[in-house]
């Protein structure tokens, strides 16, 4: 495997440089005086941003884009082996590396590499940790899987020896990483188009933890079923727990304001450390914040900086994001696409002022919908009214013969108020006819369901959130 050393800059060419992760890695390397070029199928705001920094971006992709002098080529999983540039790089014998491998090699250049892993909560928790590090003037480099408001995007290039990133389990990509601190938020069944079952997922997380160096740290949710399994045979690696019971970091005396934003008393190793007030909603974010606090305290950050940063942190794009109002009802958008995430979002919404709670849910991938259908039905049933859109295919073809109507039939058999409306214009028409003043409507899913709320808020009389 090709090593990346910041003190030995190379010429690196990115095939698919316009992706949110690839563009961030390109920017980090440019800051470290690497020569960076790249290509993509079309221009985008991200490619235009890279060009404004001085990176040559070729559109479209072509074998002629592989110039003499390129020393390493990086590609994404979306690039097929019959891609012209991929073929030309192979023909020339230029070393190649996947995006995940490059990310892992980059983090080896930092003394402290913090990786946040878990079935859900990664983007929010990574952003919370980033907010705390910035409040404490630690000048971190941050790469996150969503839009973090205080850095104006998904990337912050710092000059310190701290690197912060999400670590995704899909296709075992986090097995390419080299963390010194690993955060494990939760471990549940997901990505069942790749993993065989929950046991294979658990083994994948265990392998990730074992990538820590002997003096590394794992911060783990004590509420994960059989969490002790992940801590077996860790040698001298340090362990910090958060959650309930006798965890090292716990939240007690929890209360919520009018908008479901929690406050709690923080206990560290059983000692009362005072009140923490969050500006994000829901019980799940209490436990996300506990993991962030644990990391920050390990790095020697004061409670004052931690509390200030967490109070200021208002969330990331598409995480219980208040979008606006129309006809007197409120529209919120949320990325939840796993049953546990849906349950957490609905639990937060129940604490939010409303008459009726409506969920407009777009299932994400056929394999996930089929494998977790019973769980989806149970989670969604906690709302008053549910509208199901067509399944968002993402990377899949419908080889399992399933549709949102199958989920509707299951939910109807359980006496849930549910409607299957395939297309967005019909969904929007139904909403305008049936959702009333004082209701709360959440567009939910990891696909393009956000467009429903955007369309409604573009109508005359709508009020957008600032």
Cite the ranges covered by each PLM segment:
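NAD(P)-binding Rossmann-fold cofactor-contacting core
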Residues: 33-49
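Phosphate-binding loop of NTP-binding sites
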Residues: 5, 28, 34, 51, ...
